[in-house]
Curated annotation (Swiss-Prot):
<dbReference type="InterPro" id="IPR000860">
    <property type="entry name" value="HemC"/>
</dbReference>
<dbReference type="InterPro" id="IPR036803">
    <property type="entry name" value="Porphobilinogen_deaminase_C_sf"/>
</dbReference>
<feature type="modified residue" description="S-(dipyrrolylmethanemethyl)cysteine">
    <location>
        <position position="242"/>
    </location>
</feature>
<comment type="pathway">
    <text>Porphyrin-containing compound metabolism; protoporphyrin-IX biosynthesis; coproporphyrinogen-III from 5-aminolevulinate: step 2/4.</text>
</comment>
<dbReference type="GO" id="GO:0004418">
    <property type="term" value="F:hydroxymethylbilane synthase activity"/>
</dbReference>
<dbReference type="Pfam" id="PF01379">
    <property type="entry name" value="Porphobil_deam"/>
</dbReference>
<dbReference type="InterPro" id="IPR022417">
    <property type="entry name" value="Porphobilin_deaminase_N"/>
</dbReference>
<dbReference type="GO" id="GO:0006782">
    <property type="term" value="P:protoporphyrinogen IX biosynthetic process"/>
</dbReference>
<keyword id="KW-0808">Transferase</keyword>
<dbReference type="GO" id="GO:0005737">
    <property type="term" value="C:cytoplasm"/>
</dbReference>
<dbReference type="InterPro" id="IPR022419">
    <property type="entry name" value="Porphobilin_deaminase_cofac_BS"/>
</dbReference>
<comment type="similarity">
    <text>Belongs to the HMBS family.</text>
</comment>
<keyword id="KW-0627">Porphyrin biosynthesis</keyword>
<comment type="subunit">
    <text>Monomer.</text>
</comment>
<protein>
    <recommendedName>
        <fullName>Porphobilinogen deaminase</fullName>
        <ecNumber>2.5.1.61</ecNumber>
    </recommendedName>
</protein>
<dbReference type="InterPro" id="IPR022418">
    <property type="entry name" value="Porphobilinogen_deaminase_C"/>
</dbReference>
<comment type="function">
    <text>Tetrapolymerization of the monopyrrole PBG into the hydroxymethylbilane pre-uroporphyrinogen in several discrete steps.</text>
</comment>
Amino acid sequence: MSSREIRIATRKSALALWQAEYVKARLEQAHPGLLVTLVPMVSRGDKLLDSPLSKIGGKGLFVKELETALLENNADIAVHSMKDVPMDFPQGLGLFCICEREDPRDAFVSNTFASLDQLPAGSIVGTSSLRRQAQLLARRPDLQIRFLRGNVNTRLAKLDAGEYDAIILAAAGLIRLGFEDRITSAISVDDSLPAGGQGAVGIECRSVDAEIHALLAPLHHEDTAVRVIAERSLNKHLNGGCQVPIACYAVLEGDDVWLRGLVGDPSGSVLLHADARAPQTSAQALGVQVAEALLEQGAADILKAVYGEANNE
């Protein structure tokens, strides 16, 4: 096995490269002598920075180019933020490893105010996420939400330049890039339910590569995987992607998993909630159950309107 080489397809953003380097280090630690190299590339989502994700539309904005590299044998594995990974994979590819989850919460970042509750009426908050926007405006309808895209450094620079009073980012990304001190306050999952898979890193590879699967096995974290399976099952049943106002978060309680789901109107006028518990072995069915409970409350109408707006742009 010492002569084996693994090529990691990764986006070129600082956070994506951190994740790829993390996987590289874990593989080298688990398999001394293994040669691991990075194959950096630019995704469609990285190029289209002048529009909100909800307006670009489509799924797999941050993964398609990496999957093409796998299919054309230009890479052996692809490392993804799980919240960016579509529910379905191209034929011949699959998700074979989910690493231990980092902090899944959203982070409130401001140079002036200590928390979301302390923001004065009319304050400008930056985010490109309809999920965050819906929950923010439901709690604070007096805030102004302003579009914010770009990598973590770019977003922090825009805050520091005074374009925003505060911005909302994933806590995991800030922690991984060494910006933990920029987190003014972490937002409780009760106040801002995360995106499915937020904070977790997943590894995709070719389904037939049994040798690669074996090399990845030491990196797999089963507790995280069970939680992410439940969350992704909910997302899939709602036909969700990373650009729609769907939130879901699972935690383990003994042998059970508790899944909370949310669908929100981007205006904050309506937030639909549902939750349920099931044995960990039924995580996938649990996702469908909670998704169905949201659909019974009218989630399809909210999501149809969001998709309609994206298609009309």
